[in-house]
């Protein structure tokens, strides 16, 4: 019997990258999973009897509520965990080159959607007097020298929301934590972005930091989606009771600089 046997989990971004790895491992460990993504998941998930899926854009107003309603309909009234993994990157734009579209997209997907999903699951978790929320932030949540202003602001905001939710509901056995990945192999956070449009001047100011971190990869030190997934599932499980309001880097010490 897996360590997540009969857990009911909502996992966003479940069609690829960290979200796919998290959903796959959770199912292997006995969880029941409601996956969410703007793209269709692979057949390996669709064919699993304990996996249900909502295809939708989390930035649209009805989607967070529709996701939670679908989970309740599929698995009953209990929701043990919410894993906010879905995210989008920016074009590394500084505040002086930032477009309204990029700002609104990053804030909508990376901050507003996770907050609205937390708003939808908290009443259920309060009623059952338990629950665990894990948000995927970023190294950019801990630094101003990783990405553009939109992505950086959205992930800093998610860390603030995580801490507030953790403190507010700690007496009701509801936990809320965040992880901050660095560079992760096999992720699709740049999906839909044209890299030729990146703010090259802003990227240049960060080049030394990025080059230092990339040397690890040249030496064969890679962080895989499964590495992040296992940390997320540890935090959502009872094995991490007592860990609440934590912001945990998973970046092979990148966060130390």
Curated annotation (Swiss-Prot):
Keywords: Glycoprotein, Membrane, NADP, Oxidoreductase, Transmembrane, Transmembrane helix
Predominant localisation class: membrane
Signal peptide location: none
Membrane topology: Single-pass membrane protein
Pfam family, one: adh_short
Entries under InterPro entries matching the protein: NAD(P)-bd_dom_sf, SDR_fam, SDR_superfamily_enzyme
Transmembrane regions: 7-26
EC number per UniProt: 1.1.99.-
Disruption-associated phenotype: Completely abolishes the production of novofumigatonin as well as asnovolin A.
Active-site residues from the entry: 151, 155
Catalytic activity: asnovolin H + A = chermesin D + AH2
Places the protein is found: Membrane
GO terms of molecular function: oxidoreductase activity
Functional description taken from the UniProt entry: Short chain dehydrogenase; part of the gene cluster that mediates the biosynthesis of novofumigatonin, a heavily oxygenated meroterpenoid containing a unique orthoester moiety. The first step of the pathway is the synthesis of 3,5-dimethylorsellinic acid (DMOA) by the polyketide synthase nvfA via condensation of one acetyl-CoA starter unit with 3 malonyl-CoA units and 2 methylations. DMOA is then converted to farnesyl-DMOA by the farnesyltransferase nvfB.
Name of the protein in question: Asnovolin H dehydrogenase nvfC
Annotated gene: nvfC
């Amino acid at each position: 019997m897996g360590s997540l046997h009969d857990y009911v989990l909502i996992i966003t971004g479940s069609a690829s990258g960290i979200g796919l790895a998290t959903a796959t491992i959770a199912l292997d460990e006995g969880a029941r999973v409601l996956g969410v993504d703007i793209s269709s998941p692979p057949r390996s998930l669709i064919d699993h009897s304990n996996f249900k899926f909502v295809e939708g854009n989390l930035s649209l107003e009805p989607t967070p509520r529709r996701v939670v309603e679908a989970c309740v309909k599929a698995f009953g009234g209990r929701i043990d965990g919410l894993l906010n993994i879905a995210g989008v990157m920016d074009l590394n734009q500084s505040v002086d080159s930032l477009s309204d579209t990029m700002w609104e997209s990053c804030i909508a997907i990376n901050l507003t959607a996770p907050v609205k999903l937390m708003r939808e699951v908290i009443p259920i978790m309060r009623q059952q007097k338990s629950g665990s929320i894990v948000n995927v932030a970023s190294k950019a949540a801990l630094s101003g020298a990783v990405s553009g202003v939109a992505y950086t602001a959205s992930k800093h905001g998610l860390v603030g929301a995580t801490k507030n939710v953790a403190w507010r509901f700690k007496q009701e056995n509801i936990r809320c934590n965040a992880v901050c990945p660095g560079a992760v192999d096999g992720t699709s956070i740049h999906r839909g972005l044209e890299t030729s449009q990146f703010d090259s001047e802003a990227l240049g100011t960060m080049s030394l930091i990025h080059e230092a971190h990339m040397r690890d990869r040249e030496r064969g030190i890679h962080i895989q989606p499964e590495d992040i997934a296992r940390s997320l599932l540890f935090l959502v499980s009872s094995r991490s009771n007592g860990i609440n309001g934590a912001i945990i880097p998973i970046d092979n010490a990148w966060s130390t600089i």
